[in-house]
Amino acid sequence: MIYLDNSATTLKKPDCVKEAVWDAMEQMGNSGRGGYQTALSASRMIYQARMAVSEFFDLNHPSGVAFTSNATEALNTVIQGLFSKGDHVITTVLEHNSVLRPLYMEQERGVELSIIGADEQADVLYEKLESAIKCNTKAVICTHGSNVTGNLVDIKRIGAVCRAHQLLFIVDASQSAGCIPISMKENQIDILCFTGHKGLMGPQGTGGICIRPQISIRPLKSGGTGVLSFLKEQPQELPEHLEAGTLNGHGIAGLLAAIGWLNRTTVEVVQKKEEKLLRLFYENAKEIPKIHFYGRPPEEGVPHLPVL
């Protein structure tokens, strides 16, 4: 079988990922829920995973990594927890429904929304961004790469505009994480949402939010955290502020192993191989009658997601 649905999930995981999940199921307890060995082992592993994610995306702030079950939960947490009635948000027409539907829901609650269009090749109309900014604009949220066309968005350009206007910059890295190197620092990203089971090569049921310090987000859910249990509300400190209930420790163990595998292999090597396979597929598929491609065709030397 030739598998062609990696934008939905990667089918083959590295052996070390499968082994890490199995070992966690056999040996790890519940993180933060006790002082016995298996619980402590789980806590240490999850902290190592926070460190790995933080370094991988150049956040370098482990406490700013909050784990979720996927990118959709991460994006809902951010969108529903960051904006209030009267705020204005800018996004693009390229977004996945995990961005658009929560934004439409917030629009019904009084949040203003502007959507930047795209040209004939499905590239963002960047020149429209600054003219969309208002006095009440709070943030720009956009995908790093389209799951439909594979086009990459120039997040460095958007990040610079956001910083110049003191706006929060939120990036959905669902498709690009693990396929394209991402630096939150270089691209001036304030919040990055990711899923673990696509380009990061981790298990399904994993994802998270990377948040720069001093950004306040209302929690999407409340419950047990294993710390400060006497409080009536969620602890204010990250990551516990955004994590309620038992984490997917087994999945996070697999994600930690997957990031280790990517670091050893390097994202750059993965990117070059995927782009080579993409061009090979494109050059042959375009010869098939009645096939139509959306977005820019993949060109050698031009970064493109492994998506057509």
Q: What spans do the regions from the language model cover?
A:
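Pyridoxal 5′-phosphate
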Residues: 1-308
